[in-house]
Amino acid sequence: MTFTGLIGRICMFPLRLIIATCVRLRIHPNTLTFIGVLINVAAAWALALGKFVTAGVIMVVANIFDFIDGKVAHESQAVSEFGGFWDSVIDRFSDISLFIGLIFLYSDLRRTDYVMVTALAMMFAIMTSYTRARAESLIRKCKVGFMERPERIVLFMIGAFTNRMAAVMWVIGVLSVFTVADRIIYTYRELRDAEQVVA
């Protein structure tokens, strides 16, 4: 077993207990998803106040809910198409709230440059999700690109715990631009190839 595998097993032990408890108490996975977004709003508020470490801790808690909701759905046989839709919509609210918290902070500090960087990072972060959703309405899969939501959340946590959030916004922004471009090009090629096959 690798070191990361061992760490994964250790971390999963308490999460399995939480998942089992939620299933036993018949807590609906959609409820867990909603609790997660409320906790992320609290993290956004902490960011707005400049309390980065507090925000980082709250984000860790919020993402426990984000992780277990799907597991609880499987364990309790409550998987549904609406559940997947609900999860995606709530994730967008969670993401945007974190960006808005930072924008509020930087605006209060009169750091117009950081406000612009964060706003652009937010815009392209939203576009990474939109381009994939729109592409997958036309082609089977569009999972290309590096900057998915899990990577964004990890970067947010790194920025919070290291007090380097402005640098993290640059990283998220740049990688999101490349991800959006990659998905546009990939979708174009897939559609072009499909049209050539039909022709």
Language-model region placement:
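A feature for the membrane-embedded catalytic helix bundles of lipid/isoprenoid biosynthetic enzymes
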Residues: 1-19, 89-199
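Membrane-helix interface residues
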Residues: 26-27, 50, 77, 139
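Intramembrane alpha-helical segments
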Residues: 18-23, 27, 63
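Helix-loop junctions at the membrane-solvent interface of multi-pass transporters
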Residues: 26, 46-50, 101, 161-162
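Membrane-interface alpha-helices at helix entry/exit sites of multi-pass transporters
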Residues: 83-88
